[in-house]
Amino acid sequence: MGEFGKTLITIVTAIIGVAIIAVIVSQRSNTAGVIQSATSGFSNILKSALAPII
């Protein structure tokens, strides 16, 4: 895996970490909404990255 792959994994891990902290800290957190938002955002980024190839 190249430098780009390592950077991408680092960014995704950081986003997931922030989402986990937000869920833990907030007493009125919408856990399902947070997870859906994170996966939707990741899906959109992945689609954008693969658009020129497909």
Curated annotation (Swiss-Prot):
It is found in: Virion membrane. Disulfide bonds: none annotated. The keyword Transmembrane applies. One of its GO terms (cellular component) is viral inner membrane. Coiled coil: none annotated. It is a single-pass membrane protein. InterPro entries: DNA_delivery_prot_P32/34 (IPR020085). GO terms for biological process: symbiont entry into host cell. It comes from the Viruses. Keywords: Capsid inner membrane protein, Membrane, Transmembrane, Transmembrane helix, Viral genome ejection through host cell envelope, Viral penetration into host cytoplasm, Virion, Virus entry into host cell. Pfam families: PRD1_DD (PF11087). The chain crosses the membrane at residues 4-24. PRD1 virions are composed of a tail-less icosahedral capsid of diameter 63 nm, an inner protein-lipid membrane, and a dsDNA genome which is located inside the lipid vesicle. The DNA is packaged into a preformed procapsid. The internal membrane plays an active role in DNA delivery to the host cell by forming a tubular structure used for injecting the DNA into the host cytoplasm. Component of the phage injection machinery. Required for DNA injection in the membrane transformation event. Involved in the formation of the membrane tail tube to connect the virus interior with the host cytosol. Essential for viral infectivity. This is Protein P32.
